[in-house]
From Swiss-Prot:
Native species: Thermotoga neapolitana (strain ATCC 49049 / DSM 4359 / NBRC 107923 / NS-E)
GO aspect biological process, one term: translation
Name the UniProt record assigns to this protein: Large ribosomal subunit protein uL4
Biased composition regions of type Basic residues, renumbered to the chain: 65-75
Region feature Disordered, mapped onto this chain: 45-75
Gene Ontology MF terms: rRNA binding; structural constituent of ribosome
Length: 235
């Protein structure tokens, strides 16, 4: 099992946490990570860009001038793409840019990104990270304690609780910090709250230099992404 230092909000080491090799210490699959990021960026595209062809531009029903004897170049319509205010040749039309990735590839990409952070010593695990009220100064002090004052940091929290929500609100004014609450409170399975890691994504993990997780978030990630390892052992 891989190990990582367990820190408090003062930046002090309070213990060691064992983490799953299957989730946090695999050989990263960069191809699958690229596919995941490509999917994310493609799915952000609105696909609403639109231009009119010569058949859609208004006007130009008649020939602008006779074919011969004017001394001017021949033209059949003012809607031609070579005319000002004419139609557009091969212009964009509304389309769906969205892409899909199967569940196994998504999970492999997430495990690869987590492993990159662990192997580069850019994964920090805290006992917990909650604030009594939204205050940017409080979160900034915590980041200074972790020597991340001027670094780009992604903070991922497990539940949509008040203390975690306050951290998310506190991080909105910090340009180098993004806070994700990886939870979907509306999701349930058989009447029970399903364990989800919604929001955790490869693009943000690669964009930000450091990844900060809580102990509960690590357990949650291992529960979701470690399913394949458990299935292999019981097969």
């Amino acid at each position: 099992m891989a190990q990582v230092d367990l820190l408090n909000v003062k930046g002090e080491k309070v213990g060691t946490l064992e983490i799953s090799d299957f989730v946090f210490n695999i050989d990263p699959n960069y191809d699958v990570m690229w596919r995941y990021v490509d999917m994310q960026l493609s799915n952000r595209r609105a696909g609403t860009a639109s231009t009119k062809t010569r058949g859609e531009v208004s006007g130009g029903g008649r020939k602008p001038w006779p074919q011969k004897h004017t001394g001017r170049a021949r033209h059949g319509s003012i809607r031609s793409p070579i005319w000002r205010h004419g139609g557009v040749a091969h212009g964009p039309k509304p389309r769906d840019w969205s892409k899909k990735l199967n569940k196994k590839m998504k999970r492999l990409a997430l495990r690869s990104a987590l492993s990159v952070k662990y192997r580069e010593n850019k994964l920090l695990v805290l006992e917990d990270l909650k604030l009594e009220r939204p205050k940017t100064k409080s979160l900034k002090e915590i980041l200074q304690n972790l020597d991340l004052a001027d670094k780009k940091a992604l903070i991922v929290l497990p539940w949509k609780e008040e203390g975690y929500v306050n951290v998310k609100l506190s991080g909105k004014n910090l340009p180098n910090v993004k806070v994700i609450i990886a939870d979907n409170p509306n999701n349930s399975k058989n009447g029970e709250k399903a364990v989800r890691i919604d929001g955790l994504n490869v693009f943000d993990m690669l964009k930000y230099d450091y990844l900060i997780l809580t102990r509960d978030m690590v357990a949650k990630i291992e529960e979701v992404l470690g399913n394949e390892a458990r299935k292999a052992l019981t097969a």
